[in-house]
């Protein structure tokens, strides 16, 4: 069982980095302000199951002020701060999550002209999560939008079907071809998480995204929680295949894919990551330098992880690492140096 991760503050070097890449909110917003709600009711899904979210309410004066701030935040996320769109927006709901580490607020903003709506989240800013978000933006197939204001983090909503919901309600109805494609995507997702040391990817921490092509439906798997970036010491935590919640996906891989295909898909991930690391070399170097001098885990976790990685790779750079940022640098150096070798990490599939 994973221990609750503490929240690590964002240091000045990381703030300077975020400023350089337009990640600082121009609109003041504080997570603690949203905690001053005067009441709440439980939110249930369409099957009348408790979602562990509550819908919160504020006094009339506070609500009008909060709504205006949230609409300005929306304009920053989606239209580069164009305040002209605010007159077409309405904050339909503010929900608070009672489950998990970050206890986020989920904001629903609706366009009153056509009833289209979108969500974003307000959380306490945490250095681990910010590093995870930034690495996701640079290295993953999908870009991600987020902003920071002092000790508050604003994250866009990542659309998709929660992995646990998909596994429970939709996986069995997929065609055999679709199951093979999902197995392939899980292998790739597993490899990406392992290489970039994104931990705790249980089925409820990622989404599955169906994409309708002209003659088929294909599926993508995307992380939605970046709290466990480079924190845990156990290397298995960074490999989704070892969580019991993901067993149906692991079984799918074993049932549908041959070993040679698994190795091929893992190699494809390494090749793509190596190219992305090279193409964003300056930005990644700058981020990893800051990460290398930051504290985002415990000494116990650091020592455990670097020795486990050394035993897997025989790369002395892991053993010499003085911080989790150094471990991340060693991992990226290792992958760019050796990505053509199909036996880099033995993931156990």
Give the location of each predicted region.
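Short C-terminal domain-edge/linker segments immediately following a structured domain
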Residues: 137-140, 151-156, 185-188, 239, ...
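Conserved ATP-binding subdomain of kinase catalytic cores across diverse folds
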Residues: 32-37, 49-165
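C-terminal catalytic region of ATP-dependent kinase domains
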Residues: 215-349
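Regulatory N- and C-terminal appendages and interdomain linkers associated
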Residues: 1-80, 299-349
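AlphaC helix of the protein kinase catalytic domain
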Residues: 166-172
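A general structural signal for short secondary-structure junctions and capping/turn motifs
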Residues: 4-9, 97, 112-113, 144-146, ...
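Conserved kinase catalytic-core segment
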Residues: 173-235
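Short charge-dense sequence patches
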Residues: 12-27, 54, 75-89, 135-141, ...
